[in-house]
Amino acid sequence: MLKVNYQRLDCPECPNGYNKGETVEWKVGYELTGIPSARNNKPAEDGGDVNGWQVKSPKASLTGRDNCDGYIFGFADANFFYQMSKEEFESFIEEFSYIDRDSRTGRQKVRIKSDSKKMREWLQARA
């Protein structure tokens, strides 16, 4: 099982006024199905939306992020970002579940199980 690190990519051109390029860890877990919007910075239980997520592995990250023109999905390592379709992205996710909140930050933690063999094969085919 891998932990999901929720992140937001901010953009000054957007009406929300966030800082471009600033990456902020999200405050609450959210389902990986569908494409959430970037309306605000409220936790999901308060009507907010997650607008970025990242599935970390030892060598690379399976990433979904908002580039202000809509979502792009891909597989990133230290040097490259390989774009993929939403369907390909979701095909790597085998299991998703919420776990308890972080006692220090109060943030909701989530846990996912991903198909690491499939992730490696996908990346190797494009490297």
Give the location of each predicted region.
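Nucleic-acid endonuclease domains
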Residues: 1-127
